[in-house]
């Protein structure tokens, strides 16, 4: 067995725990080493950009769709979390809350809490004064919920706030953007805001002003000045060049075409399965569609009429089984109304109903039930007629035992499996539906047609016997390997996905239950129900068509040939949004043109609701296509390319360097983890290879740990992270253990790794001192300062010192005494490190001063603009006066009085101008003084160890 010393354990513990500058790859390595993400250089580059300076109030990450902005933000979040800055808020669209929660848990091992009405009220009952005040978990909430709880959000000293789909805020400068204004005010004190959007600039340059001012009000002046300086200008090339310079420290955008060297994109291949419904199915569809178009309906609460109508249309298109159960709920409500009281509708079959309700609340905040007393006053005869009609449709639905679309699914799967076999993929397909009843129908249909025992499904509950059995086997299989999280929801999802990967051929998933899962081993996606929201379709396909997918992906869709509206919807999604074919899927311009997918869904629903003839349907969809075309502004696309995007060659060089440095830093960090585990674990640890060990814990169980997450998953090992409780305890033990100055003998013959340098310098002797310098000012950072001298004057750099301390060693006696020259060199090295910290701070200071000076100039230009406008007005009045010789004397005198008053006002404004300019300069000085105080900081030095050494 190899011997090591407590001094070596302390050294590696210090390196692992060291707070490096977070704007460097070395500083991010600690966070990167503990995540289950196959990192790409553009993601690391973006995270470093966002972390680069605590002086900056935040950043806008605007990579194209599909490049992993979630991972970029997750790295920033993980860095904050590892530094115990844990007041973190995520504001996202309601539809993405669960996906973010799953990503944080599965990839970054960070727990989160979704703050919604139920959670908020529960925490209030637990006597938590501010339910948002949480440091043991990341808080996730929707835009709408955040806007309703601004007082609570404002009162918390957030360390980091991340806003996904941040284009919702690009019009925050407009008074009509109520939600944006509320959030901006609520987050005004936050030091770091991270905005994520693939479409930062869609319609006009004022959107860039809105997003930048949301991050930092001290970048540009007011909206009017920005418009005058950057929007209404003749020389757009000069404008773009200047804007690019102003925004380069706040906005970062990478294109998919720039990362193809690192991210392998496979193709999407579309298969369309057309079908014709049976006469009964068509009668059911047309009958319920006509019913929903009635002006007054008693079964639908008026306050949610539009929302519920849209949901019913989706269930109607899904399957007769989906609408059948929902008709029963409508009937039950009408029967209760006849008895004089109200009953809630049960729409739980629609997977996303609660999410849709949350989104709907944004535009309908007072979404209350109808007053039962008002219900009783309604026309009982009308209610009875409606009840009879729905009972007739319910009976018709129950009489339909098979669906044409379902029968065609069998054909489509055969074609899909045939195609994927040609492409070299596995015989696996994921089928998406929005209805749980449709999911049950498909399970039974496929089980009776050759797929029995090969199907698994996800629906958010998974209480069926098959899922329970899969879950039970999974728990036994992973009983001792650290895979089980303890959360049934997360664990059963992991169990189902593992079963699908290793055993099953088909996964039937409802929408919400399938969020956050990665299925890159599957190459067929079946949209059994086709959502109207293009962003949701992109998310669905992205479950399989993502980084790590080795094969082209087949996307199967269904089209009812007898439904004119369905045809036009498919045409839009396929030809306009280009969702189903090609390498990249939908473009940012097109996805961005719909603003939010939910709004687009409502637009589609409105067409279904009001159009009764084919001519009306064609006209409305033609108008919608014109609207979408108008929203893609080619001039704005060109401006975005000029202002926000970098030359491919520049990006290529930067990403190449980032890739090399990331690999190097992660390998170094993993080696520190390896040697610390080996040294501190001593006889309890058996190394298997460079990244794997067997460890016998105090309770007698033996576990295999792996420092590489991918290899850990393949081998069934436990992924070792420095955040593991026992590992954190070991680090604390090593750092707190007292160390005496000693002499250490390093024996290269006992090392399993060949270190050529020390082999070529036998019997090297020397003295080594290690100090830790901590700086607390512009953020916190720590540096290890090495002072070393050797008897033969050989120079050892930090890398060689690191290699030296990896060699097995024993303590042989006391340390040799420090010479005066050595002490002097040690002081010199500490001073040099202090100078380097100040040098880095100087650059931050200059950047911030440049930003504030430009901001001040904007404000001054705004002041002068008002005087210029007044001068123009005076000039117009003077011309009118000269031309007024034919007017009566009184009117001429009145006009002259107006001119005199305006001249007087101009003189007053001119005098005020100097005072206001002085005030702006004073404010600039005050802000710069605040920065200077931050930069001064506090520097503390701690001596770690001094050893004399000999290498044999």
Outline where the language-model segments fall:
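Amphipathic alpha-helical coiled-coil segments
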Residues: 901-921
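SF2 helicase/translocase NTPase motor core
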Residues: 1-48, 52, 70-71, 81-179, ...
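C-terminal accessory region of SF2 helicases/translocases
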Residues: 2-9, 551-710, 714, 720-723, ...
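Conserved Helicase C-terminal RecA-like lobe
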Residues: 36, 265-277, 325-503, 652-701, ...
